[in-house]
UniProtKB/Swiss-Prot annotation:
Specifically methylates the N7 position of guanine in position 527 of 16S rRNA. One of its GO terms (molecular function) is rRNA (guanine-N7-)-methyltransferase activity. It is found in: Cytoplasm. Gene3D superfamilies: Vaccinia Virus protein VP39. Belongs to the methyltransferase superfamily. RNA methyltransferase RsmG family. The gene is rsmG. It catalyses: guanosine(527) in 16S rRNA + S-adenosyl-L-methionine = N(7)-methylguanosine(527) in 16S rRNA + S-adenosyl-L-homocysteine. It holds the Pfam family GidB. Disulfide bonds: none annotated. It comes from Idiomarina loihiensis (strain ATCC BAA-735 / DSM 15497 / L2-TR). Its EC number is 2.1.1.170. InterPro entries: rRNA_ssu_MeTfrase_G (IPR003682), SAM-dependent_MTases_sf (IPR029063). This is Ribosomal RNA small subunit methyltransferase G.
């Protein structure tokens, strides 16, 4: 599986150290193990997890600006955990309302010795942090409208929202609240995934 991951990373032109590659593989191993008991993801095959979870998460790395991020509705830590492994100098808060997902994330952090991740069990609209975030990341979480409504208190003044989507979300974009602007919409090519992927980057109007 290591050679498969290295090949995928080369195709995507993503550079990770040998230690980071081992951590990504260990994450897949833990996800596979926990998934059998706790049903954390519908993806059952570890090789599919490499493409649909690890590579799909890492594909957004190049678009992130800043050092402090929150991954809302993170599920089993996606995309937050793969990103935190790849960016050890950045800080990631991973938020989800389900306890089993948060327990899994904490176990991963313990076993992989990730010190830049904080796992929080809460509903996003109820969550308050002492410091605001450079980026609010969501993957398969909610419509753009709902994400902005529930998360409007989280980004810093110049912070951004990063919404990971499948198909180009035309209908959602047309309903965007006036106080927000689209900074860019990028089509993401993920090696091993044929399906359409997009990232929508949004900021508040000044």
């Amino acid at each position: 599986m290591k050679e498969q991951l290295k090949g995928l990373l080369d195709q995507a032109q993503i550079n990770l150290s040998e230690a980071q590659i081992e951590q990504q593989l260990a994450l897949v191993g833990l996800l596979d193990k926990w998934n059998k008991a706790y049903n954390l993801t519908s993806v059952r095959n570890p090789k599919d997890m490499l493409t649909r979870h690890i590579m799909d998460s890492l594909a957004v790395r190049q678009y992130l600006h800043g050092q402090r991020f929150i991954d809302v509705g993170t599920g089993p830590g996606l995309p937050g955990l793969p990103l935190a492994i790849a960016e050890p100098d950045n800080e990631f808060v991973l938020l989800d309302s389900l306890g089993k997902r948060i327990r899994f994330i904490r176990q991963v952090c313990h076993e992989l010795k990730l010190t830049n991740v904080t796992a929080v069990q809460a509903r996003v609209e109820d969550y308050q942090d002492e410091k605001q975030f450079d980026g609010v990341i969501s993957r398969a979480f909610a419509s753009l409208n709902d994400m902005l409504s529930w998360c409007e208190h989280l980004p810093a003044e110049n912070g951004r929202f990063y919404a990971l989507k499948g198909l180009y979300p035309q209908d959602e974009l047309e309903q965007l609240p006036e106080q927000y602007k689209i900074e860019s919409i990028e089509q993401i090519n993920v090696p091993g995934i044929d399906a359409s992927r997009h990232i929508v980057i949004i900021s508040k109007r000044s």
